[in-house]
Amino acid sequence: LLPALAKAKAKAQRINCVNNLKQLGISFRIFATDNQDRFPMAVTTNEGGVADVIADARGLGDPTMMYMIFGALSNELSTPKTVVCPSDSLRTTPKNFYELVTLRDRSGGKNAAISYFVNFTADETMPQVILAGDRNLTNSQFNPGNETAYSKMVKLDPRLLDRGRGADLGFTSSMHQNSGNVVLSDGSVQQVSGQRVREQIVNSGQEHQLLFPYYRRNMN
């Protein structure tokens, strides 16, 4: 009975995660409708986005502030619960979006309130590009299970992936049993393996610059 209950719980959590990502996809697209077909990552802070905060035209910026993307979507998202996967035991849900962007990580705000990576280069005009997904995507270069550093931007080149690079791309077992969920720029959600993520990036033909919500849990 207990294994059956655990399996049913995991299935329900995954469905909830899919619904979260569907809502995220809708929110990004509503934002784009109001901002000349641009997602928050391509809109400056003066216009209500985060482009110059995370990476400006000179290549400067602070990828550790990726949580600001969801702050920019606060008008489109009904609750900060949407950005926390129910299977993610290492993330907490703040009471509101003000707490999300103002509380310290160790107090449950900022990246500690985010379960999903975001593709900084995603655009509504590229429907097959991955927009966001479960943060436990990993390979030999980035590992969400060992958060000893702050957030970073991970670049995945479709040409290199097509030549065999990234064969170790996959999801850890911490959230959805070595698989994950992603939402594309067209708003569709897919349940995927690491291999399927690699194929999606290759087929899109676009470099993906993934921002992960890391924070240093080991800090005193």
Task: Show the residue positions of the predicted features.
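Short, well-structured segments within or immediately adjacent to enzyme catalytic domains
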Residues: I15-N220
